[in-house]
């Protein structure tokens, strides 16, 4: 292909992370987005109303042809993809494992925008798992799509530091933008023939499993640093939670926003015990020191400060108030 010819692209993606890549493609004069594939509209939220994906909304704003097959088992759907005549497919958080017939639908194959430094964190939740594991660095990988999950040869990578108080939601937004920029750079170099795929080392591969609500259950038996990483990693979803049990009173299911690592425990305390109020924050005992929570939300209530929660829910406790995590209601 001549370097001056725009790449004809079919884009495949669904959530906000993918929409950032599509936005960068639409702003680049080196390509022509001829079609967009995204997941079918699905019920979401408390009202369970069907809502279009972020990618669909952006595509429609730009008058693009949007397709939403449930899968590609029907040959007619595969043929419809071929009929776009794309040079290459671009995939970003699409939500479907693509069959070989789809990968073969464009002469240059398919490339994917992945939110980690592969081969680390293959799978559905690379951003959240990196934060939950306390990693200091993550990044974006643009790689060729093969049948095996996230295992294709790498085209470009770029690292990004993870702040010690950064949540997965905040990191997601940074990586989404980085992914869009790196995608355009990758496609420009593919178009010019100046990029060489690098095989992944499967021996170094790790897997980032999709998060469930159970991942938000705070494990106070960990160190405060590990608890902080867990809470940051599950923010905004599924959110960090536990059940506070008070002797002679009703259990309280609460969620918390990321706090700060507090001082070492002055004396041994059962992990999960509330050991005091420190500068307006509730101090929870961890394995080694305290974790200070400044924003807490009881079930079916609005978020409140740690001090307000202390006064409203713990004022009848004498001394230490026992609180520990349970899975019920996850």
Curated annotation (Swiss-Prot):
The protein's superkingdom reads: Bacteria
- Residues annotated for (6S)-5,6,7,8-tetrahydrofolate binding in this entry: 116-119
Q: Name one GO molecular function term.
A: methionyl-tRNA formyltransferase activity
Gene Ontology CC, one term: cytosol
- Look up the EC number in the record and give it: 2.1.2.9
Record-stated family: Belongs to the Fmt family.
Q: What does this protein do?
A: Attaches a formyl group to the free amino group of methionyl-tRNA(fMet). The formyl group appears to play a dual role in the initiator identity of N-formylmethionyl-tRNA by promoting its recognition by IF2 and preventing the misappropriation of this tRNA by the elongation apparatus.
PANTHER family on file: METHIONYL-TRNA FORMYLTRANSFERASE, METHIONYL-TRNA FORMYLTRANSFERASE, MITOCHONDRIAL
Question: Protein name, please?
Answer: Methionyl-tRNA formyltransferase
Q: Which gene underlies this protein? A: fmt
